[in-house]
């Protein structure tokens, strides 16, 4: 993909850049592979805000993506590369030899007309999905399962890739994009290659309205609030926060404090992220 940078014809256009979408080959999604997507605006089932700064945005349909890649031994031809508003990566429409169609995350280099396959006997080629036991060391992979048969949950964002570093017993050691080294069972599936749309990181929204189109609401600084609303609030003019370390809205330490608490899976992390 390419990035188009606008000329500064207005304040909103200054420093704005957009994708050229040159890799997109089909505009309308496959009707059988979409379903309605009801907006939650960051609310839970009680109607309370659990994720702040969410709401509004353009109406979307959810594209049903095949993260499991469990159709073994059946070749599929890439029919189209499509835009998906629900993720940063592009998606590829596959037409299997038996007539079924599925969406997958489009890896870098996958083109219309290419053939992909899943299963332990598939070739080591971009877009093919294999168990980690069948993938050579040093290979770049994405869409990695954490639990056998549950579907890929790791490394699905635009431009990301993990690397298979070692195999010990029943587990593979995979280096994540964050630098974390993690043990994953050898029977878990992964897809060969790097996720496409690598220039996504170079996109600059340019104006607040474009964030609103994406469903992102404004993020207000704590120092701009009243003292009843935030520990940093209050004071005359631009007052210092009045505490040694910054705090969250709920009075907990912010910045540099680890929030991960999942002791069941800590033993699978060989090295923490950088």
From Swiss-Prot:
It holds the Pfam family Ribosomal_L2. InterPro entries: NA-bd_OB-fold, Rib_uL2_dom2, Ribosomal_uL2, Ribosomal_uL2_bac/org-type, Ribosomal_uL2_C, Ribosomal_uL2_CS, Ribosomal_uL2_dom3, Ribosomal_uL2_RNA-bd_dom. Residues 249-262 have a biased composition (Basic residues). One of its GO terms (molecular function) is structural constituent of ribosome. Residues 220-265 are annotated as: Disordered. Keywords: Ribonucleoprotein, Ribosomal protein, RNA-binding, rRNA-binding. One of its GO terms (biological process) is cytoplasmic translation. Residues 227-239 have a biased composition (Basic and acidic residues). GO terms for cellular component: large ribosomal subunit. Part of the 50S ribosomal subunit. Forms a bridge to the 30S subunit in the 70S ribosome. One of the primary rRNA binding proteins. Required for association of the 30S and 50S subunits to form the 70S ribosome, for tRNA binding and peptide bond formation. It has been suggested to have peptidyltransferase activity; this is somewhat controversial. Makes several contacts with the 16S rRNA in the 70S ribosome. PANTHER family: LARGE RIBOSOMAL SUBUNIT PROTEIN UL2M, RIBOSOMAL PROTEIN L2. Belongs to the universal ribosomal protein uL2 family. HAMAP family: Ribosomal_uL2_B (MF_01320_B). This is Large ribosomal subunit protein uL2. It comes from Chloroflexus aurantiacus (strain ATCC 29366 / DSM 635 / J-10-fl). The lineage of its organism: Bacteria, Bacillati, Chloroflexota, Chloroflexia, Chloroflexales.
């Amino acid at each position: 993909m390419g990035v188009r940078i606008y000329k500064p014809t207005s304040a909103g256009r200054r420093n704005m850049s957009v994708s050229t979408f040159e890799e997109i080959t089909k505009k309308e999604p496959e009707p059988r592979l979409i379903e309605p997507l009801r907006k939650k605006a960051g609310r839970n089932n009680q109607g309370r805000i659990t994720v702040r700064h969410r709401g509004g945005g353009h109406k979307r349909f959810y594209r049903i993506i095949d993260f499991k890649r469990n159709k073994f031994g059946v070749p599929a031809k890439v029919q189209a590369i499509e835009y998906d508003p629900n993720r940063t990566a592009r998606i590829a429409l596959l037409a299997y030899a038996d007539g079924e169609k599925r969406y997958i995350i489009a890896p870098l280099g996958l083109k219309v007309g290419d053939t992909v396959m899943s299963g332990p006997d598939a070739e080591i080629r971009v877009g093919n999905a294999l168990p980690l036991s069948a993938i050579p060391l040093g290979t770049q992979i994405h869409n990695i399962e954490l639990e056998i048969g549950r579907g890929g949950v790791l490394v699905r964002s635009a431009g990301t890739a993990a690397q298979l570093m070692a195999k010990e017993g029943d587990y593979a050691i995979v280096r994540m994009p964050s630098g974390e080294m993690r043990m994953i069972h050898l029977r878990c599936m992964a897809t060969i290659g790097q996720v496409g749309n690598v220039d996504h990181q170079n996109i600059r929204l340019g104006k607040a309205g474009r964030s609103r189109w994406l469903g992102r609401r404004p993020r207000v600084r704590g120092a701009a609030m009243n003292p009843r609303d935030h520990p940093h609030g209050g004071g005359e003019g631009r007052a210092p926060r009045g505490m040694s370390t910054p705090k969250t809205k709920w009075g907990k330490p912010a910045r540099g404090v680890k929030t991960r608490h999942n002791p069941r899976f800590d033993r699978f992390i060989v090295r923490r992220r950088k």
